[in-house]
Amino acid sequence: MIVVKRGKEPNSLLQFRKKNPDADYEDMPSSVRADVREQMWNEQKHLCAYCMRRIDNPSDVRIEHCRPRHPKDEVVHDKKATLDFKWMLGVCYGNSLVKGVKPEDMTCDAHRRNKELAINPFDEVSVRKIKYKADGSIYSEDAEINKDVTDTLNLNCPALSLPQTRKKVLLQAQKRIVQKCEGKSQGAYIHELERTYKS
């Protein structure tokens, strides 16, 4: 999972909210959605906020709401909050477009549905509680966050080879670091590890 840093909302979304103060997400025009997708795609460096898979085009971005649009308690549901850009995430389709896909083979918001999340993708402290194993699987020692990544979002889904893909990326990064730091001090090696971790 990546830490999402939201910039200023697209102007088209701001104007839509101003002109339509009682609107919610369902009322958003397709042109505004396209602007939202494109901005999130760029801000997230073309990665799904949850599984970190590459998203090839802005049109392939699914607009996810970190806070569910239809929570169980509709009484306290604030429909205007569904247009709040700071709570929107760009995610992949989580294998949901595959015909006949089983629910256990879906990931990200396709698997999440309307469940609340303990993890906050906008909070670095929260995201840093996710740990990576050598086999590419992820977990957290925080029980609620662990439930989010392993069950609610299904981020260790074997159907999409998510752990194997992470392992491959990890091995590539390790190889690059070793090559870059060959013959250098331990401090240089640690510095490169930190730089890679933060990127």
Task: For every predicted segment, state its role.
Residues 144-199:
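C-terminal, charged low-complexity interaction regions
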